[in-house]
């Protein structure tokens, strides 16, 4: 997208920053791609930032994007993509071959929104159905993988392959018994051992497809391998994983935490960021994780949230060094989660 250099004033509210903004001392104030809210505008003025780059955007962006009619159409297409994936997985479960054209169609649609990620993320955040997790998870991981690949500077062809890897990473679950996939509670040891086979099953499903690159195939079989070598199916270390698998691993874990499951409710993205920090570099590649922490929180600025005490607020800022601790405005008062550690967000609205 094109950028323009503009003065810092109320006219830029709702716009997206076109580059990282730093203080005179070289400390980042706000990262690129952040939506400019009242809180962020005040922060820019406070640090005497007089001009910045913003993206030239079409009307679906900015402070009014949620109200735009295009969002409802996006949601319809997102649900259509989930249904397409559902048919693809159910066909596999019934013994049919992979219908690669379905995977291609969904992947191409997701890629077509690469410069319209705000509305795409709105779809991911607003449509969450526990019973459809197996199918929506594949679409969501594709979206998150695309974002990570984009932020890491991958080429168009590489980004498309990463999307496909995200979409196919769990196709092996089509061979896992339904009662294990949808068990309302933790798996026992035997069930977990069966569940772990899905990575190999997935590879077996796609290994002879000449339209799928080896990089994508490796991502499918390696997405549960950990950086420290304690993952599965082979227990290899991060140095032996390819970049696609590293990206899909991060996207997979993030969506699993933030999705509605049959055995627990969905967690907020900020809870997910905290869990990812706890998991750390033993599981996820450092570069991928740091990109996620730097860029992804920006998509939740402006989100309406319900606090544990029942108050309704809005996320107005996320510190660059503390992705799990946003600033939330409630009736003109600000909760800074780096300070107000007793205050918790219950859910996104």
Where are these regions (language model features)?
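Membrane-cytosol interface segments
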Residues: 1-101, 333-337, 342-345
């Amino acid at each position: 997208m094109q950028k323009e250099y503009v003065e810092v004033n109320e006219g830029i509210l709702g716009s997206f920053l076109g580059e990282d903004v730093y203080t005179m001392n070289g400390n980042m104030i706000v990262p690129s791609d952040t939506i400019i809210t009242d809180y962020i505008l005040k922060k820019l003025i406070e640090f005497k930032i007089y001009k910045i780059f913003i993206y030239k955007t079409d009307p679906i962006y900015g402070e009014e994007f949620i109200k735009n009619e295009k969002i409802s159409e996006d949601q319809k297409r997102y649900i259509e993509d989930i249904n397409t994936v559902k048919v693809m997985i159910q066909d596999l479960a019934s013994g049919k071959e992979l219908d690669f054209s379905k995977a291609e169609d969904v992947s191409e649609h997701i890629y077509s929104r690469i410069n319209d990620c705000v509305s795409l993320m709105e779809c991911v955040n607003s449509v969450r159905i526990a019973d459809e997790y197996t199918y929506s998870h594949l679409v969501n991981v594709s979206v998150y993988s695309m974002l990570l690949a984009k932020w890491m500077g991958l080429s168009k062809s590489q980004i498309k392959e990463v999307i496909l890897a995200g979409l196919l990473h769990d196709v092996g679950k089509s061979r896992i018994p339904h009662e294990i996939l949808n068990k309302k509670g933790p798996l026992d040891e035997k069930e977990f051992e069966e569940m772990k086979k899905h990575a190999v099953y997935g590879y077996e499903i796609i290994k002879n497809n000449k339209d799928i690159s080896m990089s994508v195939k490796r991502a499918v079989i390696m997405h549960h391998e950990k950086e420290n070598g304690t993952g599965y199916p082979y227990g290899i270390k991060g140095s032996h994983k390819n970049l696609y698998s590293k990206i899909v691993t991060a996207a997979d874990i993030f969506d699993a935490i933030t999705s509605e499951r049959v055995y627990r409710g969905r967690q907020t993205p900020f809870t997910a960021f905290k869990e990812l920090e706890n998991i750390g570099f033993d599981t996820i590649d450092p570069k991928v994780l740091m990109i996620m922490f730097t860029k992804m929180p920006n998509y939740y600025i402006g989100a309406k949230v319900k606090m544990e005490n029942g108050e309704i607020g809005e996320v107005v800022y996320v510190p660059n060094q503390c992705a799990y601790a946003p600033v939330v405005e409630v009736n003109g008062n600000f909760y800074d989660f780096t300070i107000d550690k007793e205050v918790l967000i219950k859910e996104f609205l």
